[in-house]
Design a protein with these regions (language model features):
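Catalytic histidine-centered segment of alpha/beta-hydrolase-like enzymes
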Residues: 358-373
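Conserved alpha/beta-hydrolase "acid-adjacent" motif
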Residues: 331-337
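Short beta-strand/loop motif that positions the catalytic acidic residue
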Residues: 318, 324-326, 330
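Short, surface-exposed "cap/lid" segments of acyl-processing enzymes
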Residues: 58-138
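Alpha/beta-hydrolase-fold enzymes
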Residues: 1-37, 161-162, 177-286
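Catalytic histidine neighborhood in serine/cysteine hydrolases
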Residues: 345-362
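Alpha/beta-hydrolase active-site loop
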Residues: 141-159
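Gly/Ala-rich beta-loop-alpha elbow adjacent to hydrolase catalytic centers
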Residues: 167-176
Length: 388
């Protein structure tokens, strides 16, 4: 893999100070939440056994798992490729899914038997289906670059037949878009869900936070964050960031568990989500810093100034059919960030499909509404373009 220099110790003092301030903010939010927990425990009778059960459920996590039968066809240091194809698949163009890459397990695209993007793809008649499964960063992959990830996608495309329906969720969506711009001849259709293309559009909470943490465009805070992880971005930092965006969600989820501790179905749903949400994995530091600098800060993808491997990433090179899915209440990737691709690409208007779900970010990938009402419409259009 190509390499760039990743800091392994904290940089200038300003970055360290910002990092300390970030952790202080997280501790304050955590303390406030714990205070609410303490007050909640005093409301209404709870037996010692119920409280012990609640504490156990809050504290003990299992590794999340994929739910649909499949096989791993290859594995590398950055990703493994999972094949979900039917035993005797129809003769259709293969579909390749790039899951989110934000410090969580890729199995969000196959969350459960009744909340699975992969099953929805298969049920749409796209019976040749694959998903990349991002591998958590280690010291040996801390220097992985955007070029390395494009190479991973290209390897998966080659295995799937050389030309695919590319589906990208969240961070996997901008990666799919970059790949489609670089290699349009290898992408039959492009579908993105909750994926930022214009990173500065809409009222994104992440962009507001980034403005506060990059005074004068400085990346000192983010370099300090990577340095604190020994050259990788620790997944636990990403988790804390997500919780800080809306700490009341965290508090409400734990309190609802306490209120429904005797409801077996509620407990099962809680464990399923917490096992995925709280199981974190690390991201290569070089790759993460590149994302922050070129995409979140500079917005280079939509402005046309992005380069990968010495090549310009020209969104106008994208001329294949597009399917775009956004969430009306998505504060992480507002709809304007997703739908910006239609204006930047060269795809004819009649070949662009839009869907807007009512929920937020995660619901786009595993929510009942999106999977039952939005994805089937988009995937039917993809399937129509996928016949031999």
């Amino acid at each position: 893999m190509s390499t760039v220099q990743v800091p392994i110790c904290a940089p200038e003092e300003s970055g360290s100070s910002l990092l300390e301030a970030w952790f202080e903010l997280w501790l304050e939010a955590s303390s406030a939440t714990l205070g609410e927990f303490a007050r909640a425990l005093t409301r209404g009778p709870r037996t010692p056994l119920e409280l012990a059960r609640w504490l156990e459920l809050v504290a003990v996590r299992d590794k999340p798992a994929w739910s649909t039968p499949h096989r791993v066809v290859w594995e590398g240091p950055l990703a493994r490729l999972r094949d979900f194809s039917s035993p005797q698949p129809a003769d259709v163009v293969s579909t390749l899914v790039l899951p989110p890459q934000a410090g969580h397990d890729s199995c969000i695209v196959d969350y459960s038997t009744d909340q699975s993007q992969m099953r929805t793809i298969l049920e749409a008649g796209l019976e040749r289906a694959f998903a990349l499964d991002w591998v958590g960063a280690t010291a040996s992959t801390a220097h992985a670059t955007i070029e390395d990830y494009i190479a991973v996608v290209d390897r998966a495309v080659a295995h799937a037949g050389g030309r695919v329906n590319l589906v990208g969720d969240c961070q996997g969506g901008w990666l799919a878009t970059v790949y489609a711009a670089l290699y349009p001849e290898r992408v039959n259709t492009l579908t993105i869900a909750g994926a930022p293309i214009d990173f500065h559009a809409g009222q994104a909470v992440i962009h507001e936070v980034l403005d506060d943490l990059t005074p004068g465009g400085s990346l000192a805070f983010y370099k300090a964050l990577v340095a604190s992880g020994g050259g990788v971005l620790k997944g636990e930092h990403m988790l804390r960031g997500f919780i800080l965006i809306n700490p009341l969600d965290e508090y409400s989820r734990q309190l609802e568990l306490l209120r429904n501790i005797d409801d077996a179905e509620h407990v099962a749903r809680y464990r399923e989500f917490e096992d995925w949400f709280k199981h974190t994995q690390d991201i290569p530091g070089a790759f993460y810093l590149w994302i922050v600098e070129h995409l979140f800060r500079d917005n280079a993808l939509i402005s046309g100034t992005l380069e990968v491997g010495g090549r310009a990433v020209d969104l106008a090179a994208i001329d294949m059919p597009l399917a775009l899915l956004a969430g009306a209440s998505d504060h992480i990737t507002p709809p304007a960030q997703v739908f910006a691709l239609a204006e930047a690409a060269s795809t004819q208007p009649q070949a662009v499909r839009y869907e807007l779900a009512s929920g937020g970010h995660l619901g786009l990938f595993m929510g009942h509404e999106a999977l039952a009402e939005k994805w089937p419409s988009l995937l039917s259009a993809v399937a129509a373009h996928s016949q031999p």
